[in-house]
């Protein structure tokens, strides 16, 4: 099944900066959407064609001419300097779950641009005032936060929550071991928050242990455990039952989101969703990272060390005590994270293959024999057929992290609720133009903006 090491096809046919969008449709097309101001209906793919013309079938887009392969696009996104771009302010809330665990929600705070005198062109703001406010709200014992991010006071949090009466909500799920601080997530948050002169309230849900969130229950994220997403969304819906809620998932976050959508089926509280650069099949994704020479040498070790670092910074909470006895046999439903020891962490720090990490930590916690078994079970392509809400999917065939073999052509054609937009360029989550702006994030924002405005 798997290939020995090989050099990928890096030929002129895979180079370029003028990309093209292609719709993947079944014979019956896509599900009809009802307009809010009339009795008219329109299929999802026709809605995109008419109201998001930059995503219509055959649409062209232009990327940075110097980043002319998916490898270069993705490498620049991960290693380039974006410190002066996407100047988003976040207000952080600690989210407590029913099992005693926590994550954090970073609410986009566009009003802080005025509060802290943001000069976007110079990428400057009143850092002294922000620092004073940050010190006044920072909870004791929690790590310092990324730039332009601070905890909300109780009064600010109450005001933030009150927006639920007036603003539709967009929830953003980040990539593997990432968070709100990542350039792509900041770009997405910025684009979403500017739709319709600020029509959306936007929040990034940072997974347990990510983006300087704490782990409190000796439990960390996996692609199979969507309970935190479910609990957060259900809580938001319970607070404001009439509020429209949307979600955007990026990379691993897209896998989490589409797993959740498939599990919820007809009971999903979301009105629409967007999945960007989803690694639909984790086995094929691992194969790409392990056996594609370029992907292996450029990205595999980095992703593996992202995971290892997440464990390391949370080791005080994750570490099992000496002579720890497992109280029950680990299962997917009742995992036991019993392999989180200092000895295993030392092993993981030498890993270069993500499968090594999941063999040691993730699979045993669920009673699975190995990481590949976990990958097969956790792949969101398994749950795509049961997605029942309008969902926009964007994947690039030159994605150097997932490869094009993960793209779910058959399943997308068979599910009228989804529209798969295949692009021939863009890399993994990158799609950077000559100004280092992301074409991809703008498509997600444009789609949700038009959907919220026009669809019932």
UniProtKB/Swiss-Prot annotation:
Pfam families: Abhydrolase_1
GO MF terms held by the record: acetylesterase activity; alcohol O-acetyltransferase activity; monoacylglycerol lipase activity; short-chain carboxylesterase activity
Classification via InterPro entries: AB_hydrolase_1, AB_hydrolase_4_CS, AB_hydrolase_4_sf, AB_hydrolase_fold, ABHD4
UniProt keyword list: Acyltransferase, Hydrolase, Serine esterase, Transferase
GO BP annotation list: medium-chain fatty acid biosynthetic process; medium-chain fatty acid catabolic process
Role of this protein: Displays enzymatic activity both for medium-chain fatty acid (MCFA) ethyl ester synthesis and hydrolysis (esterase activity). MCFA are toxic for yeast and this enzyme could thus be involved in their detoxification by esterification.
Note: Present with 573 molecules/cell in log phase SD medium.
Name of protein: Medium-chain fatty acid ethyl ester synthase/esterase 1
């Amino acid at each position: 099944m798997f290939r020995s090491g090989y050099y990928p096809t890096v030929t002129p046919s895979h180079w370029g900066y003028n990309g093209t969008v292609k719709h993947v449709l079944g014979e019956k097309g896509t599900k009809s959407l009802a307009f809010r101001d009339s009795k008219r209906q329109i299929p999802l793919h026709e809605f995109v064609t008419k109201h998001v013309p930059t995503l219509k079938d055959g649409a062209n887009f232009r990327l940075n001419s110097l980043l002319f392969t998916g490898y270069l696009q993705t490498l620049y996104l991960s290693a380039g300097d974006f410190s002066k771009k996407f100047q988003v302010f976040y207000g952080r809330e600690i989210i407590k779950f029913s099992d005693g665990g926590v994550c954090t929600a970073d609410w986009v705070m566009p009003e802080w641009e005025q509060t802290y005198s943001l000069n976007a062109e110079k990428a400057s703001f009143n850092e002294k005032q922000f620092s004073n406010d940050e010190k006044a709200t920072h909870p004791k014992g929690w790590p310092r936060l990324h730039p332009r991010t601070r905890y909300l006071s109780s009064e600010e949090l109450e005001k933030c929550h009150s927006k639920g009466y007036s603003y539709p909500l967009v929830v953003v799920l980040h990539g593997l071991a990432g968070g709100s601080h990542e350039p792509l997530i900041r770009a997405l948050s910025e684009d979403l928050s500017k739709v319709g002169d600020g029509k959306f309230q936007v929040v990034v849900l940072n997974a347990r242990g990510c983006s300087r969130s704490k782990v409190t229950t000796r439990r960390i994220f996996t692609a199979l455990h969507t309970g935190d997403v479910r609990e957060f969304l259900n809580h938001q819906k319970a607070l404001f039952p009439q509020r429209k809620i949307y979600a955007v998932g990026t990379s691993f976050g897209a896998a989490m989101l589409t797993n959740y959508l498939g599990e919820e089926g007809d009971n999903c509280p979301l009105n629409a969703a967007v999945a960007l650069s989803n690694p639909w099949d984790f086995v094929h994704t691992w194969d790409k990272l392990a056996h594609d020479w370029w992907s292996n040498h450029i990205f595999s070790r980095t992703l593996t060390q992202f995971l290892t670092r997440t464990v390391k910074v949370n080791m005080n909470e994750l570490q099992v005590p000496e002579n720890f006895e497992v109280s029950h046999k680990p299962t997917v439903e009742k995992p036991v994270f019993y392999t989180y020891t200092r000895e295993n962490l030392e092993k993981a720090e030498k890993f270069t293959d993500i499968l090594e990490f999941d063999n040691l930590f993730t699979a045993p916690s669920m009673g699975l024999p190995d990481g590949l078994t976990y990958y097969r079970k956790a792949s969101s392509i398994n749950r795509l057929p049961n997605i029942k809400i309008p969902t926009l999917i964007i994947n690039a065939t030159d994605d150097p992290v997932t490869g094009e073999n993960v793209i779910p052509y058959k399943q997308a054609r068979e599910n009228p609720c989804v529209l798969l937009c295949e692009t021939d360029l863009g890399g993994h989550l990158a799609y950077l133009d000559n100004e280092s702006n992301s074409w991809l994030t703008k498509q997600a924002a444009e789609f949700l903006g038009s959907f919220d405005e026009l669809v019932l």
